[in-house]
Amino acid sequence: MGSSGLARLQGLFAVYKPPGLKWLHVRETVELQLLKGLNAQQPSAPEQHVRFLLGPVEGSEEKKLTLTATSVPSLTTHRLVRGPAFRNLKIGVGHRLDVQASGVLVLAVGHGRSLLTDMYDAHLTKDYTVRGLLGKATDNFCEDGQLIEKTTYDHVTRERLDRILAMIQGSHQKALVMYSNLDLKSQEAYERAVQGVIRPMNKSPMLIAGIRCLHFAPPEFLLEVQCMHETQQQLRRLVHEIGLELKTTAVCMQVRRTRDGFFGLDDALLRTQWDLHSIQDAIQTAAPRVARELRKNLSLMSGHQQQLPSAGQPWASRVQAPL
């Protein structure tokens, strides 16, 4: 088996990280399951060696012995002698998720680890759903943190929240243009903004390409955030800052990544699917799309292409679905 099974493990795939698990634990679990699957495969036929074995002479009534050339299997490659054929795999991790966060986590095996670098260089956006709770503030911006303050929120309306979100998106879009090294007054900056293809040229602070409210039922609200160069803790702090702008307080109840670049929830393998065959199939299915999208996005960063595929466009350039 060996080489053929390993050959189908070269590339990128996505898993769904549950909340409460460290990304390192996810990687180690996936590696363990892959090694178990690889080592359970039927081994290839052992090599045959010629040995001269002592035996009776055929057709002779006398008890004479002679040496006979015989082909016997070599035991040097037997798994009971050599041990497991695969002892470790090098698995790379894409944009990480902290312990409390859940959602799409991109992993790489073999040459796929170099594709992770290409993903970083393309500065692709990521989508999150962020659940907030009005009326309280904590030391870590999370619902389970140490309570600092309680406030009223009866004055908060959906319209007021939408205005705050529009202000946040507008300020971040200006920052996005600045970090893209485009002239704010140029036609190129305008056209790229309309097409949703503006990307920072280098590392930058968290940039929000789009933010909107999906659900508002005080004290709870649900946001969808499209961003890049973020951490999950920065998204929790964003909820806190939105609360302050609303003249109240707010904490974050949940951070869930629904898309990382061109990997969405539909691509993410659940924990019950972290096995050799499911991961091999996921890598093979994603490979053409990965190559195509990376080529488009890296060409865009080089200035050779003016349109980004729909997976990374801000919502302003998509058809809005009814909420």
UniProtKB/Swiss-Prot annotation:
Q: Where is this region: Disordered?
A: 302-323
Molecular function, one GO term? tRNA pseudouridine(55) synthase activity
The answer to whether UniProt assigns keyword Nucleotidyltransferase to this entry is no
Q: Which GO terms describe its cellular component?
A: mitochondrial matrix; mitochondrion; ribonucleoprotein granule
Q: Which UniProt keywords apply?
A: Isomerase, Mitochondrion, mRNA processing, Transit peptide, tRNA processing
GO process terms (BP): mRNA processing; mRNA pseudouridine synthesis; positive regulation of mitochondrial translation; tRNA processing
Tell where it localizes: Mitochondrion matrix
- Which reaction is this enzyme known to catalyze? a uridine in mRNA = a pseudouridine in mRNA; uridine(55) in tRNA = pseudouridine(55) in tRNA
Q: What does this protein do?
A: Minor enzyme contributing to the isomerization of uridine to pseudouridine (pseudouridylation) of specific mitochondrial mRNAs (mt-mRNAs) such as COXI and COXIII mt-mRNAs. As a component of a functional protein-RNA module, consisting of RCC1L, NGRN, RPUSD3, RPUSD4, TRUB2, FASTKD2 and 16S mitochondrial ribosomal RNA (16S mt-rRNA), controls 16S mt-rRNA abundance and is required for intra-mitochondrial translation. Also catalyzes pseudouridylation of some tRNAs, including synthesis of pseudouridine(55) from uracil-55, in the psi GC loop of a subset of tRNAs.
What protein family is recorded? Answer: Belongs to the pseudouridine synthase TruB family.
- The protein's name: Pseudouridylate synthase TRUB2, mitochondrial
Species = Rattus norvegicus (Rat)
Q: What is the lineage of its organism?
A: Eukaryota, Metazoa, Chordata, Craniata, Vertebrata
Gene designation: Trub2
